[in-house]
């Protein structure tokens, strides 16, 4: 059975690109258009991995991450920070506990390697 990955991304084109890449790598992908939807989907049926854009309106990726980690049903799910603000956010994301960081634009090989590493680690 393939791992389930929840993508939280407000830009349709970015979300579609992630979905296509991950689906082509045989992952089951669920999509959230905003932070609230991400929390709802994660709590209803916890995925194996969550990829969250840090710069979403209303409820940004930072707050989504805090809420996921505060909830016992989602606290152990690895989360990948995804953002275009690489210089500013990389250190902060890893410091607060994100499992990994992917900058935009991302390299497909790096993205897939990061996902594979975290999904494999989660399955152990």
Question: What name fits each language-model region?
Answer:
Residues 16-24:
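Charged docking surfaces used in two-component/phosphorelay signaling
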Residues 26-33, 41:
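Short hydrophobic/Thr-rich beta-strand motif most characteristic of the beta2 strand and flanking loop
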Residues 45-51:
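Active-site beta3 strand of CheY-like receiver
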Residues 56:
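Receiver (REC) domain active-site loop signature in two-component systems and cognate sites
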Residues 106-116:
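C-terminal output helix
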């Amino acid at each position: 059975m393939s791992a389930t990955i929840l993508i939280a991304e407000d830009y349709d084109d970015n979300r579609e690109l992630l979905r296509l890449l991950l689906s082509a790598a045989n992952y089951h992908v669920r999509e959230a258009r905003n932070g609230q939807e991400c929390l709802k989907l994660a709590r209803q049926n916890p995925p194996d991995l969550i990829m969250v854009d840090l710069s979403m309106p209303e409820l940004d990726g930072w707050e989504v991450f805090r809420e996921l980690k505060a909830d016992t049903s989602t606290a152990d799910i690895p989360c990948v920070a995804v953002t275009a603000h690489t210089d500013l956010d990389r250190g902060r994301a890893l410091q607060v506990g994100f499992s990994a960081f992917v900058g935009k634009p991302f390299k497909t090989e790096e993205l897939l390697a990061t996902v594979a590493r975290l999904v494999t680690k989660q399955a152990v």
